[in-house]
Structures are given as C-alpha cells and as structure tokens.
C-alpha cells in the first residue's frame, strides 16, 4: 500500500487500515511548481510515493517523479516548500 494509491478516492470508501496508513506516513519533501496560471504542489512521502495537488481545484492525485521531471523540463518554476509540510 502507498499513499499515492489511496489519495483522490472518496473518503467514505477508505478502509480503516487505509485511513490509518495515510495518516501515519510522513512527507519527506514538498515542492510548488508554477507556470502561468498552473500551480501544483508535489509531495514525496517516506513510502516513496508522490502526490500532486492542484492549487485551483484542491484535487490531490497520485503522481510520479517522472511527472515532476517533465514539468521541470517544460519550464515550470520550482520552489522547495518542504519546511511548510514537515514538522
């Protein structure tokens, strides 16, 4: 089980085990990607999974390091915001 496999699903469909798991896994790194009106936050979790949150819709979905690399090569500005997401 990974965080990226759980996010984006209806909360009411999550099992108790999935809820507990998603709350127990910590964020290791977080980055804001922006270009024009596009703005996303990517979080990398300690289980190796990656999620992407759209700043406009607040939708969070599973993602990948490859998607992050593609957006970087597409000219997105990247800001390290790890301190805002870790405790």
What are these regions (language model features)?
Residues 2-22:
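Negatively charged, low-complexity tracts enriched in Asp/Glu with abundant Ser/Thr
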Residues 16-87:
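Acidic, low-complexity, intrinsically disordered interaction modules
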């Amino acid at each position: 089980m990974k965080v990226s496999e759980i996010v984006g699903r209806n909360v009411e469909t999550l099992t108790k085990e999935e809820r507990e798991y998603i709350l127990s896994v910590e964020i290791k790194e977080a980055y804001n990607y922006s270009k024009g009106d596009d703005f996303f936050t990517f979080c990398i979790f300690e289980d190796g999974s990656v999620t992407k949150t759209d700043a406009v819709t607040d939708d969070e979905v599973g993602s990948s390091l490859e998607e992050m690399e593609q957006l970087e090569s597409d000219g997105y500005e990247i800001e390290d915001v790890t301190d805002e997401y870790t405790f």
